[in-house]
Amino acid sequence: ILKAINDAGVDAVVGYTQRFRRRFLTVKERLIQGQIGDVHSVVTRAFMNRMVPIATIAKTNERHNLTPMVVSGTHSLDMSMWLLEGKKPVSIYAKSVDKVLSEWGTKDSTFGIFTFEDGTIFSMNISWGLPVVWPGSVYGLEIGIVGTEGVIDIEDTHRDLVLATYKNLPGGYVPEGFEPSVDRHVDFLTSYPPGDIYKGQLWGPMREETNSWFARIQGGLDTPHATAAEGHANLIHTMAMDRSAKFGKEIALPIDPEDFYKD
């Protein structure tokens, strides 16, 4: 698909919704301006309620392909790689654990370290095995970015807006037929990545993303969308993390996509 896109010269983009949030756009602009110098160290931590993998995995028999990195970690990895734009990853070493979600055929957590051509290191960590009662309805993210002249510390866990009630609260991701296994009474509001509903209307990042896409195709604006090539690279990097964890060894990058089908 990517080859066809490139051969046709099509402006194909991928919807990584986090890119359209004000806080991350602000961080991106400060990095473009060089306000913390040359970035050399990044640490990213994503925490997710286990309702998401349980609800997602129920839809397929190919459960070994639905890992925390490939399904959900791709969003925080994309954000981190976008903020590291211009730097080339040359290796990844990762580890995974499956103490809880093994009965559903997936991993609980995957932690990894990317090394870049210029020596920059990026620690990418995700756990989507948090309890159903965890107040974050979907995603909680922390990113630390250290440069030669400064640092940017991003706290995006949504703990600044908390709802507690005697009434049972729904999950953030509840496809048809899925019911949380226990009652939930506390929510970190705004932790649902696409945005929030007000009077039947969606407000938030996905609204911005959609309007920005219209502006891109109508007016030729240079928008924050991920290109098809960036989306493909994100997929390859998440799969490389899983491959490293599977075989217990560092994986050189870039990796030939065909290698994923050899064993």
Can you name each region flagged by the protein language model?
Residues I1, V27, A240-M241:
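Aromatic/hydrophobic pocket-lining residues that form π-stacking "cages" and hydrophobic walls in ligand
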Residues D7, R22, H75, E208, ...:
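A non-catalytic, amphipathic alpha-helix used as a structural packing/dimerization or gating element
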Residues V10-V13, Q18-G105, I113, G248:
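Predominantly a Rossmann-like dinucleotide-binding segment in NAD(P)-dependent oxidoreductases
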Residues R22, M51, D153-I154, N234:
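Short catalytic/ligand-binding loop motif for oxyanion handling, primarily in non-cytosolic enzymes
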Residues L77-P170, R207-L221, T238-M241, P254-D263:
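Contiguous beta-strand/loop segments that form the cofactor/metal-binding neighborhood of enzyme cores
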